[in-house]
Amino acid sequence: MSSHPTKITFFEFLTPLITAGKKTITIRDESESHYVPNTEVEVFTLETDRKVCDIKILSVAPLKFDDINEFHAEQEAIELPKLKELIREIYPNINELYVIEYELIK
C-alpha cells in the first residue's frame, strides 16, 4: 500500500478563497507533486499550521511556468501577473511545475 500526502499548506491570505470555493487549483514544484487524485487532504495555513478545511484532489498534471495563463489565474482566483510573480517568489528558478486541481469538501 503506497502512502500519499494527507496534508497541504497554503499562505493564510489564500485560505478564504479556498473555503469560498473560488480557488480550485494550486501550482507547486516537483517536491509537492505527489498528491493522488480522489484522495482527501487536510488544508492548513503555512504560517500558523491552523486547519482550514478539507479538499479532494481531482488531478495532478505537469505545467511549465511559461504555460501559466489566464485560465490558471481564474482557477487560482488571482490576477495573472500577480500569480506569475507569486510563483516566481516561491520557486525562483523552477520552470517545471505541477498544477493540482481540487474541490472543497463541504
From Swiss-Prot:
Domain ASCH: 9-105
Active site, renumbered: K23, T26, E76
Protein's UniProt keywords contain rRNA-binding: no
Alphabetized SMART domains for the sequence: ASCH (SM01022)
EC class of the enzyme, as a word: hydrolase
GO MF annotations in UniProt: hydrolase activity, acting on carbon-nitrogen (but not peptide) bonds, in linear amidines; N4-acetylcytidine amidohydrolase activity
Keyword vocabulary terms for this entry: Hydrolase
Catalytic activity from the UniProt record: N(4)-acetylcytidine + H2O = cytidine + acetate + H(+); N(4)-acetyl-2'-deoxycytidine + H2O = 2'-deoxycytidine + acetate + H(+); N(4)-acetylcytosine + H2O = cytosine + acetate + H(+)
E.C. numbers: 3.5.1.135
InterPro entries in UniProt: AC4CH (IPR008314), ASCH_domain (IPR007374), PUA-like_sf (IPR015947)
GO CC terms, sorted: cytosol
Pfam families: ASCH (PF04266)
Family: Belongs to the N(4)-acetylcytidine amidohydrolase family.
Job description of the protein: Catalyzes the hydrolysis of N(4)-acetylcytidine (ac4C).
PANTHER family the UniProt entry points to: UCP029143 FAMILY PROTEIN (PTHR38088:SF2)
Name under which the protein is recorded: N(4)-acetylcytidine amidohydrolase
